[in-house]
A protein has these predicted regions:
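Conserved phosphate-binding elements of NTP-dependent enzyme cores
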Residues: 1-940
């Protein structure tokens, strides 16, 4: 047995459903905590071990500092020993900031900025010429070489393309002893009172010297160059008098032809989060909000009077329509003319306004005429988008706004200067747009070091970049690019990015706790992930992983299996030990691992109802103009390696098309050519893993709608009728029946000044949320608070004679959620639990049998047994005639599908093709498909 110093010991853990358990986890090992959904895995790993580690860390801060860090409750545990500093890496897309990218999160982009600031070569964004900079000595040598025997003017620029009369400047130059200046290309003698047109842009240079270049006058030439450099702030112009040719020379970066100069580059010049580097148009976001003319004029066949300009609606007697009438009259048309027949110039003025003042008639003032200005429909919409406009106005205007790629930087986020610094003909944005595998290859290629100077500067920076790119490749993220927005990443992707960042940090003696890092990862990349976790372990860290993946469990050093079931029937350690020992035990998990239990392959595949939904020419993101036919009335799985285009095809192309058709959704689908078969569907339902509510007041009862039925039931009780109670009396969200001390929360927040706030049960209602009078109304001896505290399993028996309630909660039980409480806060539900609450809600609804259900990785957070239950639910939906589309990597789900669409062959630019379609038995015959390779073993 290992010594105490080599163990993490947890004594008496009682958080959530944990049954006062003791657990021992070996340090410096890879430990998997597994078990059914709701068995207490996260309660042990995150809410006990991580929470205590975090609390101990915060305890080292001063009381003043702790006050800013929010509430950190002491977990309900007797003692934890052997705990290292803890870092939690959860499967949540935590960063919604549009400025955050894969590159900024991993800090690789910071190294790229440093590389370009130190080794980038500047080019003019006007001529494309390489920018140059000189010392005074280099300029002198260049003059003696290039201009020998020629007459030249040495000029010092003092005004560059600016307005003003410059009377005082000319006087100052004259007082310094200079006789001539060059103004806008012409040499002029300075005379007292001299000035230029103040409203025009001017270029003014001092004529410092004019001479015929000769080695004999080298000293005079040198003195003149230095003087000109001083007067021109590091910039001089040389004019070849005979050829009338001017060249620019500068101590800083400059285009020799145009005189365009750049400041000396620093890392912040390449940051889209810095004013010095960001594109001035989009402020570094890469896209801009613009009024979409197609949304303003959706149908040019109808007239303005009939509502042809969507934001204005049908003709009314108001200022906007009077102004538009005046424009129409000017072009000889009326408001009743179809928009397609109105001259383009008139439409242009209606949309974008006119500089002319319009003569309009005011009907309310006896048709009197007066002149007004007109700014256009688009300007009116933009004004409603302003920060000072009301939320309602902004929402109204938002439906006519489209986010499009910034026309100035083409989505590259940086200004023109930053984009014209290059290494090996690539600018920083082009490198950030490469997928990580391509970028790794580019840096690995010795040709990227184009000059000796760059090679010397770049060596150390390149080493850091390559090591971090390798970590991302190791966790299966080679298809992403550094420019990919963090907000667009899935939970699994963002978790693996943080994992790669942690591996790159080279920390030791840390306890890492991860939540299902294999989510979103194809079987092909699973081994890389396991190796990465072992690398983290081998550098001297302890790694605890909450995981259901079979390969991860068998590759671990130690397994803690929670169970035996979920909710109140879980919370115990049913096994703790090495994987080989676990295979010999008789637990639900071990029986799936050793083959005693398995999810069976269906004996036959459904053919569907003979109808198909066909989408053609899908080309969004990395899709290669693909077409796919989805059989209706079947369970279809969309498969492929990470980044192959699954979500692009279903979530970003197909689903928005259907949502626009059925719900008038404002979200536009990615590009596609055509879709057919949509008439055979009635609706589309997306069942994702986002929370069912974001406040503690939301719960399964409120989400499914059964709480309304329960409140109606209590309203019908004799006591409630006598007192005249309405359903609102039994709501904890409104005044009347709720406890007003805690406002229906059930707890009170105590402010502790500089210490964290503490949440304590309400002293009036003792956590029941309702006042005494409301709790006196009972059904079968139970109050409304008692009902909310029931688990679904208990509630099913309790309401067995109330069909309106039973039908809704019975479905929650059928999807495997019998262990959760009716009134359990939505904030405590896992992603998998939230998804099954949504599924149950859909199952309880009366459907026409023509619904398409779309699920994205529904197995997230699910144990083998949970997956078996989920498959039963999905099959029930299909048996009613509906269509189920699932994006999934889990082979237990894939092998049970009626139809598979496999994308690939790889991720990123190497993906986006449809490799195979058909039944699982047909898919496994494909030689190019990675999915087929692993699926073959499951079908044996």
């Amino acid at each position: 047995m290992a010594s105490e110093t080599e163990l993490i010991n947890v004594y008496g853990a009682r958080v959530h459903n944990l049954k006062n358990i003791d657990v021992t986890i070996p340090r410096d090992s890879l430990t998997v905590i597994t078990g059914l959904s709701g068995s207490g895995k996260s309660s042990l790993a995150f809410d006990t071990i991580f929470a205590e580690g975090q609390r101990r860390y915060i305890e080292t801060f001063s009381a003043y500092a702790r006050g800013f860090l929010g509430k950190l409750e002491r977990p309900d545990v007797d003692k934890i020993t052997g705990l290292s500093p803890v870092i939690s890496i959860e499967q949540k897309t935590t960063n919604k900031n549009p400025r955050s990218t894969v590159g900024t999160t991993t800090e690789i982009y910071d190294f790229l900025r440093l590389l370009f600031a130190r080794a980038g070569e500047a080019y003019s964004y006007i001529t494309g010429e390489k920018m140059v900079k000189y010392t005074d000595e280099q300029i002198l040598e260049l003059i003696l070489e290039k201009y020998i025997g020629k007459k030249i003017y040495i000029l010092a620029p003092v005004v560059r393309n600016r307005k003003g009369h410059y009377k005082e400047l000319f006087e100052q130059i004259r007082k310094k002893g200079y006789l001539n200046v060059r103004v806008d290309g012409d040499i002029r003698e300075i005379i007292p009172g001299m000035k230029v047109d103040r409203y025009k842009n001017h270029n003014i240079e001092i004529l410092v010297d004019k001479l015929v270049v000769s080695n004999k006058f080298a000293d005079k030439l040198k003195a003149s160059v230095r003087t000109a450099m001083k007067q021109g702030s590091g910039l001089i112009l040389l004019q070849d008098v005979e050829a009338d040719e001017v060249r620019h020379y500068s101590r800083s970066l400059m285009c020799p032809t145009t005189g365009l100069s750049y400041s000396e580059p620093a890392p912040h010049n390449f940051s889209f989060n810095s004013p010095q580097g960001a594109c001035p148009r989009c402020k570094g976001l890469g896209d801009v909000d613009q009024v979409d003319i197609e949304k303003i004029i959706p149908n040019p066949d109808i007239s303005i009077s009939a509502g042809g300009i969507a934001p204005l609606g049908k003709e009314k007697s108001n200022m906007l329509f009077w102004q538009i009438t005046a424009i129409c009259e000017k072009y000889g048309v009326t408001l009743k003319t179809p928009i397609k027949d109105i001259p383009e110039e008139a439409i242009e003025e209606i949309l974008y306004g006119t500089n002319e003042r319009l003569k309009i008639k005011n009907e309310s003032l006896g048709n009197s005429n007066y002149m007004v200005s007109y700014e256009g429909v688009t300007k009116y919409i933009e004004m409603q988008q302003d920060d000072e406009a009301s939320a309602t106005a902004q929402k109204w205007a938002g439906q006519y706004i489209t986010t499009s790629v910034c026309p100035e930087c083409n989505g590259q986020r940086l200004n023109k200067e930053a984009l014209h610094f290059k290494i090996n003909e690539k600018n920083i944005a082009e490198l950030a747009d490469m997928d990580i595998q391509t970028l790794f290859d580019w840096f690995s290629d010795s040709e990227t070091e184009v000059t000796e100077k760059q090679r010397l500067i770049a060596t150390e920076i390149k080493k850091e970049i390559l090591s971090r790119l390798q970590f991302l490749l190791d966790v299966g993220l080679g298809y992403l690019s550094l420019s990919r927005a963090s907000a667009s990443l899935s939970g699994g992707e963002s978790q693996r990015i943080r994992l790669a960042t942690q591996i790159g940090s080279q920390l030791v003696n840390v306890l890492y706790i991860l939540d299902e890092p294999s989510i979103g990862l194809h079987q092909r990349d699973n081994r890389k992930l396991i190796d990465s976790l072992k690398k983290l372990r081998d550098t001297g860290n302890s790694v605890v992983v909450v995981e259901h993946d079979k390969d991860m469990m068998l590759a671990s050093d130690y397994i803690v299996d929670m169970g035996p079931f979920a909710g109140r029937k879980g919370g115990e350690v049913v096994f703790a030990g090495v994987p080989d020992e676990m295979l010999k035990r008789n637990t639900l998990t071990s029986n799936y691992l050793n083959g005693k239990l398995e999810i069976a392959v269906p004996k036959k595949r459904r053919k569907g109802n003979g109808k198909h939904l066909i989408i053609e020419g899908a080309s969004g993101n990395n899709l290669k103009n693909v077409s796919v036919s989805l059989p209706l009335g079947t369970f279809t799985c969309i498969t492929g390696v990470s980044g192959s285009g699954k979500s692009t095809l279903i979530n970003e192309t197909l689903q928005p098309i259907l949502s626009q058709k059925f719900y008038r959704s404002l979200k536009d689908p990615l590009p596609y050519e055509s879709i057919s078969g949509i008439e055979d569907l009635d609706k589309v339902v997306s069942v994702d893993q986002s929370p069912i509510g974001r406040t503690p007041r939301s719960n399964p009862a409120t989400y499914t709608g059964v709480f309304s039925d329960i409140r109606t039931l209590f309203t019908g009780m004799p006591e409630a009728k006598i007192r005249g109670y309405k359903p609102g009396r039994f709501s904890f969200n409104v005044k009347g029946g709720r406890c007003e001390t805690c406002k229906g929360n059930g707890y009170k927040t105590i402010e502790m000044n500089f210490l964290p706030d503490v949440m304590v049960p309400c002293e009036s209602c003792h956590g029941k949320r309702y006042n005494r009078e409301t709790l006196e109304v009972r059904f079968k001896g139970k109050s409304i608070a008692d009902v909310l505290d029931m688990t679904i399993n208990v509630a099913v028996d309790f309401f067995e004679n109330v069909p309106s309630i039973l039908n809704k909660i019975k479905v929650l039980q059928e999807v495997g959620l019998g262990y959760i409480k009716l009134g359990q806060s939505s904030t405590t539900l896992s992603g998998g639990e939230s998804q099954r609450v949504k599924l149950a809600t859909e199952l309880a609804r009366t459907d026409t049998g023509n619904t398409m259900y779309v699920l994205d990785e529904p197995t997230t957070g699910l144990h083998f047994e949970d997956i078996r239950v989920l498959l039963g639910v999905l099959n029930k939906l299909v048996e009613k005639g509906n269509t189920v589309i699932v994006i999934e990597h889990n082979l237990d789900i894939i092998k049970c599908a009626d139809h598979i669409v496999d994308l690939g062959p790889d991720g990123g630019e190497k993906g986006g093709y449809i490799l195979a379609t058909g039944t699982p038995e047909e898919i496994v015959k494909n030689k190019e498909s990675y999915t087929a390779l692993y699926l073959r073993e499951e079908l044996v």
